[in-house]
């Protein structure tokens, strides 16, 4: 069982994975190469001044795994709350468990909604500044928490 499961390997998911792994928290991140990140231009994420989304994803994945994060090249089809935390099912059929779950799926909010989170009037999933939701140990980061695309400043 991982301590933290992260669904999504865009800027939000990779940032979370990097900081968790740097702090010796067992982290598993799920993502695929098929992503709109390839068309993005990012500024000042992970200490990188400016870079295309494809290169950012490559470097972010490498940084996170260098610090011990486990990267699973898969999409997640199902997420469930359990007594011990969360269990997710990848498109391969494999299941993974963790105490904490971070959803960083961009504008796709279906997994968040399947866990009981609701969209606000603006269409975004609500979370505190610390990314906490009303579901214990469930966090939501990145565009999942915003109604439209913006540039975050870190």
Regions inferred by a protein language model and the residue ranges of each:
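Beta1-alpha1 glycine-rich phosphate/pyrophosphate-binding loop at the start
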Residues: 2-55
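Short, glycine-/small-residue-rich phosphate/pyrophosphate-handling segment
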Residues: 146-154
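Residue-level detector of anion-binding/catalytic polar loops
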Residues: 26, 70, 118
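FAD-site-proximal beta/loop scaffold in flavoenzymes
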Residues: 108-146
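Short hydrophobic core segments
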Residues: 5-7, 95-107
